Regions:
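Gly/Ser/Thr/Pro-rich low-complexity, intrinsically disordered segments
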Residues: 21-253
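Sec-dependent N-terminal signal peptides of Gram-positive bacterial secreted proteins and lipoproteins
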Residues: 4-22
Length: 253
């Protein structure tokens, strides 16, 4: 009989404020604006100062509306470096017309994995450990900045352990438990001996403030990367990690 376990994600949000920065660009002496459609404008403002000379400021002005909505795009997988032109092509191939784009997060130049949180339509695409300031958008297109801290656990019976990272790179010598989905990529990219727990989602979703029920399909140890089956969830950790976590995963047969 395959074992069933529960995965729970809880979010902690705190409102934070933004203070206006000092005017250090100098005296404004020119600029232009271009209407891009869907209540969106592209602005250029030119400044000049005695200390640094001529400077240009570029920004997009967006009025929330139903024709243009902010989205997060990282291509077909979390793993992999891509430039903004590749992101634009990915959107066009999926029936979307981009108006403007910016880097949404710091990311690894080696892996392309964002260093913070990525959430789309409530689904946890990628999760970091600990809290961070986050930029979000409501369904009506309006934006906000809040402190975001998602705490995730996996439970088997009366015992639970923390899952610190979701769709992040599990590297050799790191202690915590990771959770990977097929959104991470085709393989786990692991380069050391790890314990892997392959699970099938039953009920619930990998969403903020929700519980997801999983059925354990297989538990094994392997040195290197493995394929991530489509639709499956993989729990894993380096075998040299925290013994309490290792014992928990190994008992999920």
């Amino acid at each position: 009989m395959r074992k069933k376990i529960l995965f729970f994600a809880m979010t902690l949000l705190l409102l934070t404020g933004i203070t206006a920065s000092a005017d250090v660009l100098g005296e404004q002496n020119g600029g232009w604006s271009t209407y891009m459609g869907a209540f969106t404008y592209f602005h250029n403002v030119q400044f000049n100062s005695d200390s640094v000379g001529k400077q240009n400021e570029y920004y997009v002005e967006y009025t929330p509306n139903e024709d243009a909505v902010p989205i997060v795009v990282n291509g077909a997988s979390i793993w992999g470096t891509r430039n903004i032109k590749q992101a634009e092509q990915y959107m066009q191939e999926n029936g979307l017309r981009p108006l403007a784009g910016i880097n949404a997060d710091y990311f690894s130049f080696k892996t392309g994995i964002p260093m913070g949180y990525t959430i789309a339509d409530g689904e946890i695409i990628s999760k970091e450990y600990g809290g961070q300031d986050a930029v979000g958008f409501r369904s009506d297109g309006t934006g906000f900045i809040k402190w975001l801290d998602i705490q995730t656990t996996v439970t088997d019976g009366e015992k639970s352990i923390d899952v610190m990272y979701i769709n992040k790179w599990c590297q050799a010598g790191f202690d915590p438990v990771y959770l990977l989905t097929d959104k991470f990529g085709k393989t786990t990219k692991t380069q050391s001996e790890c314990i892997f727990v392959i699970c099938t989602p039953n009920e619930g979703r990998l969403h903020v403030d929700e519980t997801m029920s999983l059925t354990v399909d297989d538990v094994f140890i392997y040195n290197g990367e493995i394929e991530i089956p489509e639709g499956k969830v993989v729990l894993l950790m380096d075998t040299s990690g925290v013994s309490e976590y290792y014992d928990f995963l190994s008992r999920l047969h």
